[in-house]
């Protein structure tokens, strides 16, 4: 496979969203495809192949660009919905 020959991580090469959780207070996500729903208790993000649902308290979309977003608050649960 061409991706293996280039030695690139498959998820990076195929544009899959990447999620980084910093404790239970902050989430960094890149390669997203937009926010679908936003309240202080629930944020749904289009991850390309899945919808990523963040549940918690006092959730806040701190930063959002075309490629990256950062969510703060008390993150209680993350769900991937196909």
Predicted regions and their residues:
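N-terminal intrinsically disordered, cationic/polar leader segments
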Residues: 1-82
